Amino acid sequence: MKLLLVLLTIASVALAAVDDVAVNNFKVGILAKDQQPSDENLKTVALFSKLPNELKADASQRLYVSFTVAKKSDNAKVKPHQVFLRFVAQNGEDVVVVVNPDANGNYVYDNVLRTAAKSFRNLSGQFKISLLVGDVTIKNPINWQFANIDAALPVAYEPTPKSQQVHFEPLNEISHIFRQPEKRPSALISDLFTIICLSPLLILVVLWSQVGINFQNAPASPWVPIFHVGLIGIFGIYFMFWVQFDMFVTLKYLAVLGFLTFVAGNRVLRAISESKQKSE
């Protein structure tokens, strides 16, 4: 089945490729940006002939080329698969652009040279312009140089990478905005909070003054002064936490001093209990 399809394709191509083609109504010219094409500003060129004078254009002008492709046998218009304009620079580099037909089968290339320069890879100066026409059904492919053009195309410079750019100019002044201090409460609220925090100690001092402190029943033990010194030290740690220490430093000192005060207090209570048992 595949072999049959291949043979049918070859046969159809062989039968189709029986006609020669010709390029008719070939016109070329340089137009201004908003100028309409007409017989006055376009030159007609016969197939396989060449314009005697060189075309000259700058980047603001348009290159206009129009033509039709028809069979020689019946002059019917055809649309070959490959229709190109080829621009060959003096250094041998070439640029090939596609020419597409309109709905009526007419081929038109109309482009501002500044826009076309993007595809010319920074080429500028003199070019040889050729028309290329080809198709599997065409017996005589066309490669026709019909004109020379001197085009002053703009050179598209490649941008310098940002890492390689050097700017000799003063830099903007760096201004640092410091964080605004947080709004603190009024002095009245601060004093009231301090009094509330110190109120348990004040109440303790008042109650001690009313009840009285009896040092006569204190046992003769070295743990007694250690216990009282530990209590005073704990109050001192609280005070330092208030003015300087953070929570972690406070807990570190409080763990050591609190354990020592706890042991000393336990020993004092045991000594008091033993002295009471002896007195009874």
UniProtKB/Swiss-Prot annotation:
- State one Pfam family annotation: Ribophorin_II_C
- Cellular component GO terms, alphabetically? oligosaccharyltransferase complex
Provide Cytoplasmic-side residue ranges.
209-222, 266-280
Q: Which GO terms describe its biological process?
A: endoplasmic reticulum organization; protein N-linked glycosylation; regulation of cell division
**What residue stretch is flagged as signal peptide?**
1-16
List the transmembrane segments: 188-208, 223-243, 245-265
Where would you find this protein in the cell?
Endoplasmic reticulum membrane
Show the InterPro entries listed in the entry. Answer: Ribophorin_II_3rd, Ribophorin_II_C, Swp1
Superkingdom of origin = Eukaryota
Q: How does it sit in the membrane?
A: Multi-pass membrane protein
Keyword hit for Membrane? yes
The residues exposed to the Lumenal compartment are: 17-187, 244
What does the record say about the knockout?
RNAi-mediated knock-down is mostly embryonic lethal. Embryogenesis proceeds more slowly and embryos are osmo-sensitive. Twenty-five percent of embryos exhibit cytokinesis defects. Sixty-five percent of embryos have incorrectly positioned cleavage furrows. Other phenotypes include delayed chromosome alignment at metaphase and disrupted endoplasmic reticulum morphology.
Similarity comment: Belongs to the SWP1 family.
Q: How does it assemble?
A: Component of the oligosaccharyltransferase (OST) complex.
Q: What does this protein do?
A: Subunit of the oligosaccharyl transferase (OST) complex that catalyzes the initial transfer of a defined glycan (Glc(3)Man(9)GlcNAc(2) in eukaryotes) from the lipid carrier dolichol-pyrophosphate to an asparagine residue within an Asn-X-Ser/Thr consensus motif in nascent polypeptide chains, the first step in protein N-glycosylation. N-glycosylation occurs cotranslationally and the complex associates with the Sec61 complex at the channel-forming translocon complex that mediates protein translocation across the endoplasmic reticulum (ER). All subunits are required for a maximal enzyme activity.
> Under what name is this protein listed?
Dolichyl-diphosphooligosaccharide--protein glycosyltransferase subunit 2
Q: What is the lineage of its organism?
A: Eukaryota, Metazoa, Ecdysozoa, Nematoda, Chromadorea
